[in-house]
Amino acid sequence: MKVLVAVKRVVDYNVKVRVKADNSGVDLANVKMSMNPFCEIAVEEAVRLKEKGVATEIVAVSVGPTAAQEQLRTALALGADRAILVESNDELNSLAVAKLLKAVVDKEQPQLVILGKQAIDSDNNQTGQMLAALTGYAQGTFASKVEVAGDKVNVTREIDGGLQTVALNLPAIVTTDLRLNEPRYASLPNIMKAKKKPLDVVTPDALGVSTASTVKTLKVEAPAARSAGIKVKSVAELVEKLKNEAKVI
C-alpha cells in the first residue's frame, strides 16, 4: 500500500506571532518555522502503518516555497521514503492547495492519503474534505484511530458526545485529530539519512493546475488587548465587584 502524507510549513507553535504594520498579514521575518503539528501526527500514523507491514511506501508532499523542503526533510527523517514539493510562493487558499494535491494524487495513485485535520496558521479545516470531493475518494475526518483491514480502512472519529467508527473503501482520505497518536522525534542518524532520500520539486504549471485565488485577505488584526485580572480575598468581595464594577449580576 502506498500512503501519501501532506505536510505544511507553518510558524512554530511556540512563537508569538506579530501582525504587519499595514495589517496585510503576519510578519514572518526571522520567525522560526516548523511542520504543522497535525501534519506531524499524519506522518507518524503513516510510519506506524509501515512498521506494521501495512504500508509499503510513504510519500510526503508539501505545497509552498522552496523553504518548505526543510519540513519535507523532517518528514523523511521521521520515516517517509521520498518527498515531493509543489513549489509556489503565492498565498494559496484551501481549494488551490486541494487542486494541487489532487494532481499529485492522480500521478502517484496512493491507496491512502493522510492529512492533518487543519493547519494552526489558518485553522480552515477544509483541504482534506475538498481533496476528497475532487478525487471522489471516501473520507474519514477527525480520526482518533485508524485501522486498515483488507480493502477498507476503519476510522474512529471524535464527535460531540462520543465516538463514531466508519468503514471507508480504499482508496480513501483520512484527516488526523490530536489524540490519534504521539509523534516521535527524528534521531540524528535518520536526519542524516534523510538528506540522501529523493525530494522532487514540481510547479503548479507542470501539474497543469491554476492557483488563481477566489479569496482575498482584506485585513489581519491582532487580538484586542485584555486588562490583567485581579485577586480577591473573599466571595463577598467577588460578588461586590461582579455586581458594582463588572455589572454582570
Swiss-Prot record:
The keyword Electron transport applies. The keyword rRNA processing does not apply. Its cofactor is FAD; AMP. SUPFAM superfamilies: Adenine nucleotide alpha hydrolases-like. InterPro entries: ET-Flavoprotein_bsu_CS, ETF_a/b_N, ETF_b, ETF_beta_N, Rossmann-like_a/b/a_fold. One of its GO terms (molecular function) is electron transfer activity. PROSITE patterns: ETF_BETA. Binds 1 FAD per dimer. Binds 1 AMP per subunit. Keywords: Electron transport, FAD, Flavoprotein, Transport. Pfam families: ETF (PF01012). Disulfide bonds: none annotated. It comes from the Bacteria. Belongs to the ETF beta-subunit/FixA family. PANTHER family: ELECTRON TRANSFER FLAVOPROTEIN BETA-SUBUNIT (PTHR21294), ELECTRON TRANSFER FLAVOPROTEIN SUBUNIT BETA (PTHR21294:SF8). The electron transfer flavoprotein serves as a specific electron acceptor for other dehydrogenases. It transfers the electrons to the main respiratory chain via ETF-ubiquinone oxidoreductase (ETF dehydrogenase). Heterodimer of an alpha and a beta subunit. This is Electron transfer flavoprotein subunit beta. The gene is etfB.
